[in-house]
Amino acid sequence: MTDLTSLTLAEARKGLASKTFTSLELTDAHLKAMEEARALNAFVMETPDQARAMAREADARIGKGEAGPLAGIPLGIKDLFATKDVRTTACSKILGNFVPTYESTVTSQLWRDGAVMLGKLNNDEFAMGSSNETSCFGPVGNPWRREGSNTTLVPGGSSGGSASAVAALLCMGATATDTGGSIRQPAAFTATVGIKPTYGRCSRWGIVAFASSLDQAGPIARSTRDAAILLRSMAGHDPKDTTSVDIPVPDYEAAIGRSVKGMKIGIPREYRLDGMPAEIEKLWSDGADWLKAAGAELVEVSLPHTKYALPAYYIVAPAEASSNLARYDGVRYGLRVSGKSIGELYENTRAEGFGPEVRRRVMIGTYVLSAGYYDAYYIRAQKVRTLIKRDFEDCFAKGVNAILTPATPSAAFGIGEKGGADPVEMYLNDIFTVTVNMAGLPGIAVPAGKDSQGLPLGLQLIGRPFDEETLFSLGEVIEQAAGRFTPVRWW
């Protein structure tokens, strides 16, 4: 039998339907792969007993002809999603051994459709990071290495565990979240496909909040088709999330293979950065050529406020984070470090519970929201955000169907190589992705090539609100032209 872990989700679904193998066999193959890949540190909690029980239930349903769209498919869940009776920590000490008594909407929809949970995946603490180095469980290793080197690289962040596990064939797909690039950047670093849907497309209920007006859940998968299948189950209106949008969920998979002839693809001139590596330039130009060869029309567009996106993002996101994280005080749940007074209890708990990056962002957020600086920083950043959104609206009003950009300014870097003394160096990783969150638009990262050291590089497509289907159609064109990339196993 083929190694079951090498199948795509779509192929596994066919195999299960034709009874070529069972969900239990598929699940066991992935559990074995997880055991062998512990060096990657992708999973922070493995749930083998639960996985096997869910697989048996899926097999019974398949046998009765009652299979859901994801029946028997083993998935990994980012540790930001609340999972009933399974520890959920956001990879922070402050949540300790918190075990939710409820299930997030996104994961409950995956279980409704028959998926199997393999365990919880590592991420940057409270999703704050671009390299998966801020987790209290330690950094995640990227399955990819530079040719001829033994240096362990980062998988990107904050959804580094999700991207690493999918790239290393430990799960058939994974949930992830994206606040400023946390799905698309790790996908680009690991040669996986990651889509950040339109804000409001997937419910945020039961997901640990970082920046509520920017956070959005989405899948990381092995192919555009797999990502489309997963997004259909994850998306949908949820009355429990006031920002969830009541728009019917289309069959995203039907968009795979759809003609892109006549589509207008915008190439934004502001994304041509000074000192951009020639490899990234070439990748971008290759992507444009592939879309043109498929019948799309390329047009240069202008997004004039792009250069203000990163500074505005690093005001808005920490401001919302400082408000959201105020609930972690050691009183009701999670870590509790006692003190002589309530103030001391808060101080001691937060000092011990929050890692340095989270503390930094909470302090930035508290500063920009303080009385003397609120107008100068926070209000101005929100005005910039409106201008960024307007740039995209103007572009789409001219008939542009999607915008093509690089996903990241470089390939993956080594653990500990960036951001030590200067956090801004790490923040610059999100330069191509934050605009999409600021405008609430959908964006997909698709593997498109390799750099001179054999590391994967990705391209990003940005779409109109709630037009993820076009992104899947265009993404699949790039995927077919570039081919599939798999890492050489070292773990």
Swiss-Prot record:
Top enzyme category: ligase
Active site residues of this protein: K78 (charge relay system), S158 (charge relay system), S182 (acyl-ester intermediate)
GO-annotated molecular function: ATP binding; glutaminyl-tRNA synthase (glutamine-hydrolyzing) activity
Keywords: ATP-binding, Ligase, Nucleotide-binding, Protein biosynthesis
InterPro entries: Amidase (IPR000120), Amidase_CS (IPR020556), Amidase_dom (IPR023631), AS_sf (IPR036928), GatA (IPR004412)
UniProt-listed Enzyme Commission number(s): 6.3.5.7
Stored Gene3D superfamilies: Amidase signature (AS) domain (3.90.1300.10)
Disulfide bonds: none
Gene Ontology cellular-component annotations: glutamyl-tRNA(Gln) amidotransferase complex
Function: Allows the formation of correctly charged Gln-tRNA(Gln) through the transamidation of misacylated Glu-tRNA(Gln) in organisms which lack glutaminyl-tRNA synthetase. The reaction takes place in the presence of glutamine and ATP through an activated gamma-phospho-Glu-tRNA(Gln).
PANTHER family reported for this sequence: GLUTAMYL-TRNA(GLN) AMIDOTRANSFERASE SUBUNIT A (PTHR11895:SF151), TRANSAMIDASE (PTHR11895)
Protein name per Swiss-Prot or TrEMBL: Glutamyl-tRNA(Gln) amidotransferase subunit A
Gene name as annotated: gatA
